[in-house]
Every structure is written in structure tokens, then in C-alpha cells.
Design a protein with these regions (language model features):
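Short amphipathic alpha-helix adjacent to the substrate-entry channel of hydrolases
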Residues: 71-88
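Bacterial Sec-dependent N-terminal signal peptides
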Residues: 1-22
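Alpha/beta-hydrolase active-site loop
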Residues: 96-117, 140
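Short beta-strand element of the alpha/beta-hydrolase
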Residues: 55-64
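Alpha/beta-hydrolase fold active-site loops
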Residues: 57, 83, 159
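Short beta-to-alpha linker loops that shape the active-site pocket of alpha/beta-hydrolase fold enzymes
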Residues: 65, 89-96, 167
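Primarily recognizes the serine-hydrolase "nucleophile elbow" in alpha/beta-hydrolase
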Residues: 113-170
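N-terminal cap/lid segment of alpha/beta-hydrolase-fold proteins
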Residues: 19-53
């Protein structure tokens, strides 16, 4: 009986390990549409995705920093969640205007719509989120359709907006 239980345990462990999701990160992909040097430097994103899953939801994450500082990072709480997470850098004040920050956010979202299926994502499951200044970018992109219209994307095609602590007065 012990041998049967041992064999069964080994079989279950083997099956469980075979199903484990493996995640991969690709860093510093350029999404910039502008060719100026500052855009080429800052308009980069990292994509964290499960290698063996398809039809995954995607969260585009904009960092905080008052639009004047900060850098992209994949939030720990979103890792190993069965989702694709895209962490975005954007140009910062005072080198650019708030409108250019919003334009960068829209360009990153457009990049995601164009590229996410290559990484196992589903265009119908794209969420936009961020903290502080990232929350502001999230809200403004969703509330003012002109930003995504520039890329022929309807803001209503986003699965959801999840801003964390951003002011909404421009």
C-alpha cells in the first residue's frame, strides 16, 4: 500500500510541476512614435508574460512620480498572476508638456493593442492601471477619447481602468 501511495504521490507531483507556468520578462522595448532623442531614451516598456498561456488578460502599468520622476517596474503583486504585465516609462516634466506625457501613454497602449497577441494576450482583455501620476495617466486616457483616437483605438475597447491615487485636474 505504501508503494502505491508513493507512486501516486510522485505521479501527482510530476503532473503538478509539468503544469507550472513559466514567466519571461523582456526589457526596454521601444514604443515611441517620435524620433527625438528624449523619446527614444524614455519611451520604453518591459513586458512580463506567462510563456505557456494564451488568451491572457493584460495590465499596462504606469509608474508614479508626479510626472517629474520615476521609472517603470513590474509590481510584485501582479507577478505570477496568469496575466501579462507591461510596465511603461514615459517622458517627464519639465522636458515635455503634460500633453506629451499623455501622448506617450496613448502610444504605449497602442503598442500593446498591436503587439500583445504575440505574447499570449487578448486585445479584449487590456486593462490600464498606475499609481499616483500613473493613475492620472490612466484616468485621462480613459476619460478623453482623443488620446487613443489618434491611433484609431476606441477608449471603450479597454477592458478597464484601474487608477490608484491620481489627481484628475489638468
Amino acid at each position: 500500500m505504501k508503494r502505491i501511495l508513493l507512486c501516486l504521490s510522485v505521479l501527482i507531483c510530476t503532473f503538478t510541476n509539468a503544469q507550472e507556468t513559466v514567466y519571461k520578462t523582456i526589457e526596454n522595448l521601444t514604443y515611441a512614435t517620435s524620433q527625438d532623442a528624449y523619446a527614444q531614451e524614455r519611451c520604453k516598456l518591459d513586458i512580463y508574460y506567462p510563456e505557456n498561456l494564451k488568451d491572457c488578460p493584460t495590465v499596462i502599468w504606469f509608474h508614479g512620480g508626479g510626472l517629474t520622476s520615476g521609472n517603470k517596474s513590474i509590481p510584485t503583486k501582479l507577478k505570477k498572476s496568469g496575466m501579462i504585465v507591461i510596465a511603461v516609462n514615459y517622458r517627464l516634466l519639465p522636458k515635455v508638456t503634460i500633453s506629451e506625457c499623455l501622448g506617450d501613454a496613448a502610444a504605449a497602449i497602442a503598442w500593446t493593442f498591436k503587439e500583445v497577441e504575440k505574447y499570449g494576450g487578448n486585445k479584449k482583455k487590456i486593462f490600464v492601471s498606475g499609481h499616483s501620476a500613473g493613475g492620472y495617466l490612466t484616468a485621462m486616457i480613459g476619460l478623453d477619447e482623443k488620446w487613443l483616437n489618434e491611433y484609431s483605438i476606441d477608449a471603450d475597447s479597454l477592458a478597464g481602468l484601474i487608477p490608484f491615487g491620481g489627481q484628475v485636474i489638468s
